């Protein structure tokens, strides 16, 4: 027999399943009672009633008939589990009024409300039923993480125990209290950002740490997570930056300008902020992230492809609220904003060649260094002012160097070469 699979289920698979329509609909929720009318005039009782067992356990159950009708016997009775008739070799008559059942190596319940174990009369009518709960006790929840949106609330989520599935209805309660005083509180808004999460909407204190933990309970036991201690100011996140605008930078074919505003919900609070930008081309799903935006609210993306549509998003990390030393939590990304770079006016492969201007060398150390600098710049997107100041300084130095070379060669501003004068006389 395969490990972990119950004997009766494995054997009953050889028989065609009994239609669920033959059972009362309350059985689907494992709510059983005495049949009302029908051909089953006798009633019975199953013992034990509604047992709770660990996976791999065995069950010894009995169905005992009682009633006032003469001739009532256990002969012809049979069992079903979740609508499937169990093999007759799993049952035996104890006496004229009692049918016993032996199940071994039970698997986890197929529904958290319990499996349906039913005793039937010869004609198929229901005599008695029991809910069978088979599962595992909960394990200690872990990995609790919490965040506060704009310091107005607190949302937490966690991971259930190592195995996760207990096969039984398991209740998770998030508890919290002020660290040094106050009573335990229970979160009430569950499943807000997933199956294991809870939302505390209001009445939170600032500048005072909270203790937060999760308790898990089911029919087989309980478990409690480690305590998480946090200050709301240390876990603040905010809405994505609004009013993100992306535009061209004049006629520069490889650059786009991105501008946005600070989170309005935090405008009255003392905090720093850092931003991230990510962008992708229109026909790609791969994003490139720019990390060095610092606390600016504008950025120039460089090294882009000419004549290409780009989608851009921005997110914010409002760290350092009221002097908090924590790293902060990133917001969601803003809605994508699109813009295109200008088309290149330079000839492509096979086209004309751009000739150097008169007096400009077509090669040399300076031009090679500039080519290397621009090639490096095209591979990166920079948003810090320092990068563009360096680029502007590079251009100014190049212009000054070019002017110096022209003067050394005797080229006048008008482009005419000056005539060399000899000594007077």
Curated annotation (Swiss-Prot):
* Glycosylation sites (chain numbering): 95, 107, 143, 171, 295, 385
| Organism domain of life | Eukaryota
Give start and end of each Ig-like C2-type domain.
Answer: 35-134
Which N-terminal residues, if any, form the signal peptide? 1-33
GO CC, alphabetical = CRLF-CLCF1 complex; extracellular space
Which biological process, per GO, is one annotated for this protein?
Answer: positive regulation of cell population proliferation
Residue intervals of the Fibronectin type-III domain: 140-235, 240-344
Q: Where is the composition biased (Low complexity)?
A: 415-425
**MF terms (GO), sorted A to Z:** ciliary neurotrophic factor receptor binding; cytokine activity; cytokine binding
Q: Describe, from its UniProt entry, the tissues in which this protein is expressed.
A: Widely expressed in the embryo. Not detected in the brain of adult mice.
Query: SMART domains this protein is in?
Result: FN3
> Is Secreted tagged as a keyword?
yes
Its keywords, alphabetically, are: Disulfide bond, Glycoprotein, Immunoglobulin domain, Phosphoprotein, Receptor, Repeat, Secreted, Signal
Question: Is Ion transport there in the keyword field?
Answer: no
In this chain, where does the modification Phosphoserine occur?
Answer: 222
Task: Please tell me which stretches of this chain the record labels as motif WSXWS motif.
Answer: 330-334
InterPro entries referenced in this protein's UniProt entry, alphabetically:
FN3_dom, FN3_sf, Growth/epo_recpt_lig-bind, Ig-like_dom_sf, Ig-like_fold, Type-I_Cytokine_Rcpt
Which residue pairs form cystines in this protein?
A: 146-156, 187-198
Q: Which Gene3D superfamilies match?
A: Immunoglobulins
Q: Which family does it belong to?
A: Belongs to the type I cytokine receptor family. Type 3 subfamily.
Its domain description in UniProt is:
The WSXWS motif appears to be necessary for proper protein folding and thereby efficient intracellular transport and cell-surface receptor binding.
What's this chain's function?
In complex with CLCF1, forms a heterodimeric neurotropic cytokine that plays a crucial role during neuronal development. Plays a role in the initiation and/or maintenance of suckling in neonatal mice. May also play a regulatory role in the immune system.
On assembly, the entry states:
Forms covalent di- and tetramers. Forms a heteromeric complex with cardiotrophin-like cytokine CLCF1/CLC; the CRLF1-CLCF1 complex is a ligand for the ciliary neurotrophic factor receptor/CNTFR. The CRLF1-CLCF1 heterodimer, as well as tripartite signaling complex formed by CRLF1, CLCF1 and CNTFR bind SORL1 (via N-terminal ectodomain); within this complex, the interaction is mediated predominantly by the CRLF1 moiety.
Question: Could you tell me what this protein is called?
Answer: Cytokine receptor-like factor 1
């Amino acid at each position: 027999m395969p490990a972990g699979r119950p004997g009766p289920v494995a054997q009953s698979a050889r028989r065609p399943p009994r239609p669920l329509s033959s059972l009362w609909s309350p059985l689907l929720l494992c709510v059983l009672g005495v049949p009302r009318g029908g051909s089953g005039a006798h009633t019975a009782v199953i013992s034990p009633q509604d047992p709770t067992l660990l996976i791999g356990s065995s069950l010894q159950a009995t169905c005992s008939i009682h009633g006032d009708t003469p001739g009532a016997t256990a002969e012809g009775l049979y069992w079903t589990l979740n609508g499937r008739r169990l093999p007759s070799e799993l049952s035996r008559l104890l006496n004229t009024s009692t049918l016993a059942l032996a199940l071994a190596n039970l698997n986890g319940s197929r529904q958290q409300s319990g499996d349906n174990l039913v005793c039937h009369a010869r004609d198929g009518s229901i005599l008695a039923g029991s809910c069978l709960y088979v599962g595992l006790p909960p394990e200690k929840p872990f990995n609790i993480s919490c965040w506060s949106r704009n310091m107005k609330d607190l949302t937490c989520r966690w991971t259930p125990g190592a195995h996760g599935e207990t096969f039984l209805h398991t209740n998770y309660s998030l508890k919290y209290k002020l660290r040094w005083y106050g009573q335990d509180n229970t979160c009430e808004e569950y499943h807000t950002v997933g199956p294991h999460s809870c939302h505390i909407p209001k009445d939170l204190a600032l500048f005072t740490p909270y203790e937060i933990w999760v308790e898990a309970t089911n029919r087989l036991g309980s478990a409690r997570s480690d305590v998480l201690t946090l200050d709301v100011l240390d876990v603040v996140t905010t809405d994505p930056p609004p009013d993100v605008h992306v535009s061209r930078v004049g006629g520069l074919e490889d650059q786009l300008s991105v501008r946005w505003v600070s989170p309005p919900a935090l405008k009255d609070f003392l905090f720093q902020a850092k931003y991230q930008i990510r962008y992708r081309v229109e026909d790609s799903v791969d994003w490139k992230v720019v990390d060095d935006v610092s606390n600016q609210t504008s950025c120039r993306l460089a090294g882009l492809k000419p004549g290409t549509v780009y989608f851009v998003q921005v997110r914010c990390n409002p760290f350092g609220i009221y002097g908090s030393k924590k790293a902060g939590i990133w917001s969601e990304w803003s809605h994508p904003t699109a813009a295109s770079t200008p088309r290149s006016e330079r000839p492509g492969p096979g086209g004309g060649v751009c000739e150097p201007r008169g007096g400009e060398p077509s090669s040399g150390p300076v031009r090679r260094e500039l080519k290397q600098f621009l090639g490096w710049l095209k591979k990166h997107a920079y948003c810090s002012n320092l990068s563009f100041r360096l680029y502007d300084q590079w251009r100014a130095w190049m212009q000054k160097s070019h002017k110096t070379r022209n003067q050394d060669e005797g080229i006048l501003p008008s482009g005419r070469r000056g005539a060399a004068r000899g000594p007077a006389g």
